[in-house]
Amino acid sequence: MMTRAEYIESLRRLNLKVYFMGELIENPVDHPMIRPSMNSVAKTYELAEKPEYQDLMTVYSPLIGKRINRFCHLHQSTEDLVNKVKMQRLMGQKTAACFQRCVGMDAFNAIFSTTYEMDQKLGTEYHKRFTEYMKFVQENDLTVDGAMTDPKGDRSLSPSRQEDPDMYMHVVEVREDGIVVRGAKAHQTGAVNSHEHLIMPTVAMKEEDKDYAISFAVPSDAEGVFMVYGRQSCDTRKMEENADMDLGNAQYGGHEALVVFDNVFVPNERVFMCREYEFAGMMVE
């Protein structure tokens, strides 16, 4: 497992494209607006190192045969679910902020079970692919952004009936070695602090929407991926010189970003759903 320092250094090695207030941020890790949220995620690594919290923050993984950070775990029992909630309470007590790894953890379990059902009914190999992906995540102790929410556009219309087809993430090309996708995921908690984006559908779909029924994973610095960092009223006080008041939680925080996918290639081994529209609702649930 990574230490807090190793996690921070791993973010520095990423070639992220992050825009804030109309400008490309050269160093997201040390940016005063982003650093508090990064500190929250780093706390999940820090507490996993401490002996007094290891029963909550870490767990044995049957996939790789060693202890892992619980945020990378596939739930095996009722006890796992209880300890998940206890871990979240502990993180809330330590940060008083959003620690940004909950949706990724839930996505692991939703996709793991849904891909199993898909393989059983359709004879696909999505579950095998996702199992291998989970081994990769656990071995490398990665923070993964579970990305579900699309911009949506006109919410009275289905994905395929939108005036702008990019309002929902969709497949634009299927190749022998993978797929090309385009669209965006909105309000992505902790996206800038994540090593990977794990994409899921956002609504149940009909056959006419099949190009939008996709699930896949890409590195957060994959070619064609960029993020627009969100902000709230008065939060730029953190950027003011010698600011020492009205900063809210100055040490810890959360953030959301719009993650844009501009014709991003995804290799087959990282595709976990492609046009199996009848399973989109199951994955969402």
Segments (PLM) and residue ranges:
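A short, Trp-centered hydrophobic/proline-enriched beta-strand micro-motif
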Residues: 141-154
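Internal helix-loop-helix
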Residues: 46-144
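FAD-binding core of flavoproteins
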Residues: 151-285
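N-terminal-proximal low-complexity accessory segments that begin disordered
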Residues: 1-47
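Glycine-rich loop at the start of a catalytic domain that most often binds anionic cofactors/ligands
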Residues: 31-35, 61-71, 160-162
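Acidic, aromatic-enriched beta-alpha/helix-loop junctions
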Residues: 39-55, 211-217
